[in-house]
C-alpha cells in the first residue's frame, strides 16, 4: 500500500505523541497471561499454511505503524485484541529509512547519507521492532517482516537512491552499492530474530515495481535476494511482497494483469527460494471495479495451484462501504483452491495516544465493520474447517 503524504505525517505525529506518554516497562507489559503458540516455525503443506501445528486457512491484517510505537503497552494491546479476535498473522514494516537523523526522537531504523548507511540498533531504532517480535511471541501471533518499501513512505528505495546516486527507484535493483547496503540491513534484521517462532516469513519489499524495465530485472533481483535470505535463514519462509502484476492466467487485458510494472507473477513464484505467492487488491487505484476483484483473486489462486504453492491474499482495501465490498473478496479467497490466507489492509485500534492511523481503509477493533470483516470471516473459516 502506498500511503498518502498526509498519512505519512499522521504516522510520524502518532509516534511523536507516544514518546511523550509514560512508557510501559517490559515487566509491566508482561503482566497479562497471553497464550503463545507451540513454538514451531510456520511452513507450507501443499497449498496450505501450517501455523503452530495447525494446517488450514488463516486470517490476519497489516500494520505498518506498530514497529514505530514507543509505548510497549500499545503493542501488547494490539496483539491481545488480535489474539482474542482469532487473527493469526500480522504484516509489519520492518524498514524505516531516513536520509538525516531525526532530531525529535522519532523512531528510525536506518539512515542513508553521503554513500553510507547506518543501522540504528538503539532504543529509538530496531529495539522497537524487538519488542514487537517479543510481544508477538507471547501472544502467538505470526509476523511478516519486509525490508524496504518501493514507495517513498518511511524512506523506501528512494532513500537509498538519494544517498548513493541515481535517477529513480528502478536504479535500486542494479546498483551494487545500494544492494550491498540493503543486504547488510537484511542480515542485521534476520540475525536478530533467527530463532523466533513469531516470524511467519521474511519479505523482500513492499510492492516492488520496476516500471518500464525488462521482466528479467525484477525477477533476477527477486531470485538473488531470496537466495541470500535463505543463506542466512533456512528455517523461516521467504516471500516477495508484490502486488501480483504480470499474469496470463485469467487475464482480461487490464493494467494489473499486464507486465508494464516489470513483474512476472508466475515466473517469480516458480523460484525455489520463494515459498508462497503474494498479491494485493486495490481496484480504485488500478482503474478497475470492485466486482473485478473476485476474478483477480481466483486467477492468483489458479496460478498458485498450478505452481504447487499457496497464495497469500496479502493486502486489500477500499475507503468506503468496507463490508459490502470486501466481504465478497474474502469469501472468494476462502473458497478458492490455492489461496491459503488473507490479510486485510489495515488493522486499527485505540492506542494510548488516540486512534491508530486511518487511511480510509482502516478497520478498527470493536466496530461493526470489524464484526463483519473479522469476527464473521473467522467464523466462516472455522465453519469451512469443520465441514472438511
From Swiss-Prot:
Q: What is its EC number?
A: 3.2.1.78
InterPro entries reported in the protein's UniProt record: Glyco_hydro_5 (IPR001547), Glycoside_hydrolase_SF (IPR017853), MAN-like (IPR045053)
The alphabetical list of record keywords is:
Carbohydrate metabolism, Glycoprotein, Glycosidase, Hydrolase, Secreted, Signal
Where substrate binds, per the record, is at 93, 206, 282, 345
Q: What class of enzyme is it?
A: hydrolase
Signal peptide extent: 1-20
Q: Which GO terms describe its biological process?
A: mannan catabolic process
Q: Where in the cell is it found?
A: Secreted
Q: Which Pfam families match?
A: Cellulase (PF00150)
Active site: residue positions: 207 (proton donor), 315 (nucleophile)
- Please give the name of this protein: Probable mannan endo-1,4-beta-mannosidase A-1
- What organism does this protein naturally occur in? Aspergillus terreus (strain NIH 2624 / FGSC A1156)
